[in-house]
A protein has these predicted regions:
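Conserved N-terminal beta1-alpha1 strand-loop-helix module at the mouth
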Residues: 1-77, 150-155
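Hydrophobic faces of well-ordered beta-strands that scaffold small-molecule active sites
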Residues: 5-9, 34-36, 79-83, 107-109, ...
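Active-site-adjacent beta->alpha loops and helix N-cap segments on the catalytic face
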Residues: 16, 40-68, 88-93, 111-129, ...
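Catalytic cores of alpha/beta
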Residues: 16-28, 94-96, 141-153, 192, ...
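Generic structural signal for hydrophobic
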Residues: 25-26, 72, 98-102, 126-127, ...
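Glycine-rich phosphate-binding active-site loops on the catalytic face of alpha/beta enzymes
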Residues: 32-43, 102-113, 158-168, 208-228
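Metal-dependent phosphodiesterase/phospholipase catalytic core, i.e.
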Residues: 59-104
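Alpha/beta catalytic cores of nucleotide-metabolism and tRNA/nucleoside-modifying enzymes
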Residues: 183-188, 197-203, 207-246
Length: 246
């Protein structure tokens, strides 16, 4: 089975037109999915690189997603949305309906099981009512009992962080992290992200049994310079790394 490569983009960074053009320009067959991050006032589990992309919060609204979603649909590229519960909780119903109306079917909520565990079960139920599946977000610090509970409450693939946040470099044994994740979650596809530093890390994840990777921090500087070519080249390097690992 082909290993999956997901690319994270913060909507509105560096500007709305660039993001739409970038999604249109990425060569066919390279990216399996885009993670579209809703700009956050408190992206607490993102590292410095991704956090820097959230400065355009006041210049983005959900209507700006429409062009990107049309392009991805036409190109048959899967899309999920990443949003912090701290940003959508106060107007949860309208936000979920707006996403559902745009045929968004998968959502990652990094702070849900950590900071809002008391509302997580009810939120997952409301997601299901609007046709959206929660993609559980775990990392090496997530207790097994929490993983088991939310694996049983969901049916999507799993997002598993190598690190507690993106763009940081705490020493970690990648093979051990992947093997532990697979032992606790034996029957679901697991995509690893949050802390992949280079192609070597990506290869090690796949060789240890991971089903794919998600990258974002690696291309932030290129996006900030409006350099589509450099960002695409980095994505190609990760594609080649995971393809050669099989």
């Amino acid at each position: 089975m082909k290993s999956r490569l997901l690319v994270y983009l913060t909507l509105g960074f560096p500007d709305n037109e660039f993001v739409e053009d970038f999604v249109r320009t990425v060569p066919d067959g390279i990216v399996d999915g885009f993670e579209l991050g809703l700009p956050s006032s408190d992206p607490r589990y993102d590292g410095p690189k991704i956090r820097s992309t959230h400065g355009n919060r006041n210049h983005f609204n959900l209507d700006k997603m429409d062009g990107i979603l049309r392009i991805c649909s036409d190109r048959k590229i899967r899309v999920n949305v990443l949003s912090y519960y701290s940003d959508i909780g106060n107007s949860e119903s309208s936000n979920l309906l707006a996403l559902s109306d745009r045929s968004v079917h998968e959502m990652i909520v990094p702070d849900l099981l950590i900071d809002y565990a008391e509302v997580a079960d009810a939120f997952i139920s409301r997601l299901k009512e609007t046709g959206i599946s929660l993609i559980p977000f775990f990392n090496a610090a997530t207790p097994d009992r929490v993983i088991e509970k939310y694996v049983n409450k969901t049916c999507s693939w799993i997002y598993y962080g190598l690190q507690p946040s993106t763009g940081i470099n705490v020493p970690v044994n990648i093979s051990d992290v992947v093997e532990r994740a697979k032992s606790v979650i034996p029957e679901r596809d697991i995509i690893f992200g949050f802390g992949i530093r280079n192609g070597g890390d990506a290869m090690e994840i796949i060789r240890a049994g991971g089903h794919g990777i998600a990258i974002g921090s690696a291309i932030v500087d290129d996006l900030a310079r409006h350099d589509k070519g450099a960002a695409i080249q980095k994505i190609l390097e990760y594609r080649e790394a995971i393809d050669s690992a099989v």
